[in-house]
Regions:
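Histidine-centered active-site/metal-ligand motif
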Residues: 1
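Beta/alpha (TIM)-barrel catalytic core signal, keyed to glycine-rich beta->alpha loops juxtaposed to Asp/Glu
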Residues: 4-195
Length: 195
């Protein structure tokens, strides 16, 4: 469920509880909540004896909102999972845009989520620098970006899209890749947070 700021939280959680009790869902999942609101929602659901196990939020090297709004810490403290959508930043964290915007990219064919103005020289340089870090790890940029999302165990899963089965198989290799060094994490932060 995605948060509706115009509906009282108690009403929303009550409706979600009814969905679970009626057998239409096994548990509650929340999407795009901040840390404080998630804690309040979790308390309401706990009082209702309704299982709540997962948060779904956008999270990637470039988008760290769940760190800034307290959700990541609140989920860890409350032993709730997080599933990250857009872990590759709509494809920005792949090798697809290392040399600019390809003619057949979603920027040109489907401009709903990714726009040409997001690819200024500063962003492209950041992507290229991140790619160099990935190469030094023996990984593709996509693999490193996925590893970064799940690096500390707080994010329990990622939603990945793929246009080819081979992409999924390549991305699964992150499950066996080496942990990041402190130096690598600092370099990643320098690349991403300089935007």
């Amino acid at each position: 469920h995605r948060m509706d700021p115009d509906t009282p939280l108690e009403e929303t959680m009550g409706a979600l509880d009814q969905i679970v009790r009626s057998g239409k869902a096994l548990y509650v999942g929340l999407s795009n909540y901040d840390g404080e609101t998630m804690k309040r929602a979790a308390a309401i659901l706990e009082d209702l004896h309704c299982p709540f196990i997962i948060n779904q939020n956008s999270y990637n090297i470039f988008n760290r909102t769940i760190e800034e709004n307290g959700l990541k810490q609140a989920a860890a403290d409350g032993k709730k999972g997080i599933i990250s959508f857009s872990p590759l930043a709509q494809g920005m964290l792949t090798d697809r845009y290392l040399h600019g915007i390809p003619k057949d990219s979603r920027v040109n064919t489907d401009g709903r989520f990714l726009h040409a103005d997001q690819f200024d020289e500063k962003r492209l340089n950041s992507i290229r620098s991140l790619n160099e870090i990935a190469a030094a790890r023996g990984e593709s940029l996509a693999q490193m970006a996925l590893k970064w999302v799940i690096r500390d165990g707080v994010v329990t899963s990622v939603l990945i899209g793929a246009s080819r089965p081979a992409q999924i198989l390549e991305n699964l290799k992150v499950l066996n890749s080496a942990p990041f060094t402190e130096e690598e994490l600092k370099k990643i932060d320098q690349c991403a947070l300089s935007l």
